């Protein structure tokens, strides 16, 4: 099983709040079966499929998070998730 990891900065003004977390979870759900996503900040981690878990990380603008994706196609899945974060979750 392959595992890929990247560190990305939170760029949207409100950080990893409810709407941003929901967009991340929806993106994880669209990745398909067989992939596992974890998000870590400051030694705390959350399942990529958990809105509440992501919000509890308390990631604010300027913070960095580590995204780890494991499973078949993890490299492409990670690129999609990192792109979402770098795009500020589509927020202004």
Regions found by a protein language model. Name each.
Residues 2, 31-35, 75-80:
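Signature of N-terminal electron-transfer/Fe-S-associated modules in redox systems
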Residues 5-7, 38, 64-68:
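Beta-strand secondary-structure signal
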Residues 2-12:
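Short amphipathic
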Residues 11-52:
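Compact, glycine-rich, soluble single-domain proteins
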Residues 7, 27, 53-56, 77-80:
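Residue-level recognition of specific faces of alpha-helices
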Residues 57-92:
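C-terminal structural segments of small proteins and small subunits
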